[in-house]
């Protein structure tokens, strides 16, 4: 069991280090696994079996806020998430805010996921001279070719601050959703900050130090397993009747 937990931790750390420069990435955590003993009549057997955790746990603390000055860079100030439509998958939550406008006007993030509005519909922004995004996520533009000073609301970035009892997990596709695979309803409770990009919440120094510690523990555990095997084989030899 311990060796399996260490293996899973190493996999998560490799994933975290690979994504340390991805805006809004949430650090993967290793799930705690439980142990179940076999029930027998009037007692318990000493043999135990590992029970796998649900998987997909992640750290929710915010990453570093970088004031980029780019008009399509947005970040969530504290708690909350944007809504996205991944290229291959169901609606999900994200903290990634490096936005760009496609030729057809669709607003996407740096991963190519479509940004959704408060109705969970794709946001399409017409050509503009300037753009301003409010704390509520409202997208105000000066239309290209419009009258001087004319502004229109081109859309609203859908956001949510989930209730305390909502459990979020990363799915097999790496996207954040509720444990049942759905997403909470938009409530526009998050604070949106324009000209700012949130980095990942991965601490590379911490990950590397933990990786070294895990590797040492793995080697110790492996030596213990080999020693136990040798002792078992030695005991079997001693108990073998003479020929």
Regions from the language model: what does each represent?
Residues 1-243:
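Amphipathic alpha-helical polymerization modules
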């Amino acid at each position: 069991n311990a060796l399996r937990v260490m293996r899973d931790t190493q996999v998560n750390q490799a994933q975290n280090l690979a994504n340390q420069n991805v805006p809004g990435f949430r650090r993967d955590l290793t799930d705690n696994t439980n142990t179940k003993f076999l029930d027998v009549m009037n007692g318990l057997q000493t043999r135990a079996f590992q029970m796998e955790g649900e998987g997909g746990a992640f750290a929710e603390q915010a990453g570093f806020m970088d004031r980029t000055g780019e008009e399509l860079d947005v970040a969530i100030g504290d708690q909350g998430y944007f809504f996205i439509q991944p290229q291959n998958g169901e609606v999900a939550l994200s903290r990634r805010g490096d936005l760009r406008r496609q030729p057809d006007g669709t607003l996407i993030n740096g991963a190519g996921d479509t940004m959704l509005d408060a109705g969970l519909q794709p946001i399409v922004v017409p050509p503009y001279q300037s753009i301003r995004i409010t704390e509520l996520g409202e997208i105000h533009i000066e239309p290209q070719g419009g009258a001087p000073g004319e502004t229109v609301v081109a859309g609203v970035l859908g956001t949510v601050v989930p209730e305390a009892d909502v459990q979020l997990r990363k799915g097999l596709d790496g996207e954040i959703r509720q444990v049942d695979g759905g997403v909470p309803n938009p409530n526009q409770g998050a604070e949106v900050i324009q000209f700012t990009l949130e980095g990942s919440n991965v601490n590379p120094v911490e990950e590397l130090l933990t990786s070294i510690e895990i590797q040492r523990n793995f080697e110790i555990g492996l030596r213990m397993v080999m020693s136990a095997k040798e002792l078992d084989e030695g005991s079997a030899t001693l108990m073998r009747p003479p020929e």
